[in-house]
């Protein structure tokens, strides 16, 4: 059995050396493994450091993009070149703990095709956790895949899963849902999540809306052909819930965090617009 660890990297030079050390320790119990760093157009020296590490560790392979294509493209390229029977994905910022890899392997070998991490005790700011909880709830509701953390970077797959997935745009957020549509067995385990130590989060407000449209496309492709009325009814409800959640978030910022409405007027108006569309 061979393990492939696929790690998208975008400007994580401060984390990579320590990540490599932790990976080497965690993977030492496996008879064969490879580490694929997919550099997504980094400009901070990440590529040079990975090349340096590879000089003393022949388990490392580097795939380099010359500009930033996004996480879905990086994962798709990693899946294409991964040679392992099991493929692990994780982020390169040290928030995912490599020590969880043996736990993921054990769960996969219980008969599952994909095991997703669940960051139950998540070490992120509210600007990430609130949208994440909303999208996880709605994705569970509409896809029927009963996991809590669709977008957790730490996952393990059987090779058959990654070779059949079509990942582009922002669809990496919904890989468990895509796998579930193809009748693969999907489950989750609670994993240790760590606060970010180096660099800045790549999370931006735009991801909230990109994720919204990606989920619509997934639902459209899977359900529109079967029942257009049912599909568009779901979309209307989903859109209404998104708008309602945005308004609740703005109210929370106003009455619990003391931030004036004027500071978030664009978000407030967007929430109203989305509710009307729904």
Language model regions located:
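Short, well-formed alpha-helical segments that are part of the catalytic scaffolds
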Residues: 12-26
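A conserved acidic beta->alpha catalytic loop
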Residues: 39-48, 94-95
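Donor nucleotide-sugar binding loop of glycosyltransferases
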Residues: 12-15, 42, 71, 97
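Short beta-strand/loop segment that forms part of the nucleotide-sugar
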Residues: 20, 31-42, 63-64
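Cell-envelope/extracellular polymer assembly enzymes that use nucleotide-activated donors
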Residues: 2-4, 34
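Acceptor/aglycone-binding surface of glycosyltransferases and processive sugar-polymer synthases
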Residues: 52, 61-67, 71-81, 86, ...
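Hydrophobic helical membrane-anchoring modules
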Residues: 174-278
């Amino acid at each position: 059995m061979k393990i492939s660890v696929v790690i998208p990297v975008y400007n994580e030079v401060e984390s990579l050396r320590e990540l490599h050390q932790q990976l080497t320790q965690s993977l030492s119990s496996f008879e064969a493994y490879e580490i694929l760093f997919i550099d997504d157009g980094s400009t901070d020296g990440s590529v040079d450091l990975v090349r340096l590490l590879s000089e003393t560790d022949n388990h490392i392979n580097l795939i380099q993009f010359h500009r930033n294509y996004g996480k879905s493209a990086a994962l798709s390229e990693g899946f294409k070149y991964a040679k392992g029977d099991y493929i692990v994905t994780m982020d390169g910022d040290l928030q995912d703990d490599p020590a969880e890899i043996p736990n993921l392997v054990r769960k996969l070998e219980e008969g599952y095709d994909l095991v997703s991490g669940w960051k139950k005790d998540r070490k992120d700011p509210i600007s990430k956790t609130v949208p994440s909880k909303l999208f996880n709830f709605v994705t569970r509701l509409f896809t029927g895949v009963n996991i809590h953390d669709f977008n957790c970077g730490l996952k393990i797959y059987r090779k058959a899963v990654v070779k059949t997935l079509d990942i582009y745009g922002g669809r990496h957020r919904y890989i468990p849902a895509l796998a579930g549509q193809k009748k693969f067995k999907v489950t989750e385990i609670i994993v240790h999540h760590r606060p970010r130590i180096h660099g800045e989060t790549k999370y931006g407000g735009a991801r909230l809306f990109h994720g919204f449209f990606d989920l619509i496309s997934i639902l459209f492709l899977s359900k529109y052909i079967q029942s257009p009325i049912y599909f568009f009814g779901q979309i209307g409800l989903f859109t209404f819930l998104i708008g309602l959640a945005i308004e609740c978030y703005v109210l929370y910022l106003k009455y619990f965090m003391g931030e004036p409405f004027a500071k978030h007027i664009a978000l407030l108006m967007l929430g109203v617009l989305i509710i009307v569309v729904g």
